Amino acid sequence: MKALVKTSKAPGLELMDVDIPEIGANDVLIKVKATSICGSDIHIFKSSPGYMRSVTIPTIIGHETCGEVVEVGTCVTSLKKGDLVSPEPLIFCGECYYCKMGAAHHCQNREILGVSINGTFAEYARMPARGCWKHPKDISSDLGAIYEPLGVAVHGVLADEVNGKSVAVFGCGPLGLFAIGAARVFGATRVFALEVASKRIAMARQLFPDVTVINPREQDAIKAIMEATDGLGVDVSIEISGSAEALRQAFKVLKHEGRVSLVGVPSRPIELDTHPDIIRKEARVLGVLGHVIWKTLWQVRALLDTGKFDPLPVITHRFPMAEFEKAFALATSGEAGKIMLYP
């Protein structure tokens, strides 16, 4: 089968012929229908030092996927051939302290799909059956593939109460747009969105006409938000961009006793003035790691079932897997939404 493989620590990927994986008694074999490019895939493509420490060489990358079960292990009873599934990227053991405490996303023995073990930029992928989310039969492959990143955004939004709150989302890439949509549906009274890339600004304004979109390079974002909130600031800041300046702004515009959700991963350590921005404000700072297995995906399903947010327009480009170089060049430009690859 064809697969996108990270073959060295150098930047880039290779499209290679590899064997179709053999499954164990508790596994399923998935015929991949669609996979979207994640920010972590971009870091692996670029060989960003902070990510490469965790990458096994060689490894098939990719994890945001929808596929059809075509083979079932002898001990699997929860899935059958023909089921449409998305894999949970964090392969959890089910036996460690955190797994048994209901926090499998913190598994002490975890493997990461497309990072430490083979992923889903391929024609077929092997997954433990317990790590598959089963979709309704009528779901589109594209929607199934973005279920997991939707989960990351929803986890960032719902890490604490958002209903009746004002929210600022920092970064209007795919996760940021998902977070804006989720915040609106789950009851945010007013949403601000901050972004510097012109195409992403245009997309945010087109998708969410009622959201106040601010370009911090063109106006004083802190002043604009404080004036719009009677000098109080927002109840919730959700930082998704990973930008050091955006992170500082997220605290500056925060109301006293407000909440900051940290979703984006900075490329370097960031210095904060904790006294005025955290201690005096009694700010609550919540790190967001992926999503809560499986609670968050039920929340994603609830979000979609409302019919009030369609995430598919966030997908802006689609490529066959053979054109991966073009797709990743576009993804690294910061001028696209979600990008899909098809085997």
PLM region spans:
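C-terminal hydrophobic helical "lid"/dimerization subdomain
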Residues: 31, 248-252, 294-343
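N-terminal Rossmann-fold NAD(P) dinucleotide-binding loop
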Residues: 176-177
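N-terminal glycine-rich cofactor-binding segment
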Residues: 5-22, 39-71, 86, 106-116
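Glycine-rich beta-strand-centered segment in the early N-terminal region that forms part
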Residues: 21-35, 50-97, 136-138
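Residues at the starts of beta-strands that form the adenosine-phosphate
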Residues: 2, 166, 189-191, 259, ...
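Adenosine-nucleotide cofactor-binding segment
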Residues: 169-170, 184-249
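Glycine-rich phosphate-binding loop and adjacent beta-alpha segment
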Residues: 206, 243-306, 343
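NAD(P)H dinucleotide-binding glycine-rich loop of Rossmann-like/cofactor-binding domains
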Residues: 93-170
